[in-house]
């Protein structure tokens, strides 16, 4: 199998439970909720995405076989971090369109803690160490358990009071990044203040001016 990768880069996790943690990000090309073209955004299922996942032209992007992909990932980690606490985030786009058991198995052999960020449309039995599900209100929601649930807010079709009964350890609301960003931040904070166990998640990497 060849994996189509937008980019592989070093950074800190900027949102959710692992905010501030050093990581290698493996961003896969492609998504099943938007094709990534601006002209098609308004009619897509996820029309507020803030990520460029089109093509393979990002840093360390390309089409890789398994061995080469692992080599690039190890190189990015080893030239950046000295810690043996290896942490990788599989993201997209929608990573579960491409991630398979061979990739997961090989990353585990290299002692990576594997986190995946998915929109929840695809069920999976792959043995990740951490699963973050970020559902979209107009999409099918099939993966309804994991470690961390992250809802971009506001999405008014979700019943946030019922969602907390699902099988997740942590529940985050993340302000929708749009022209009403300040308003969304205040809405998020105010909701979380009075509705446990919801907790606000902010994209600190954007505040710091990093990827």
Where are these regions (language model features)?
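Conserved AdoMet/S-adenosylmethionine-binding subsite of the radical SAM
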Residues: 84-87, 96-211
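Conserved beta-strand segments that form the floor/walls of ligand-binding pockets within enzyme
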Residues: 4, 25-27, 89, 132, ...
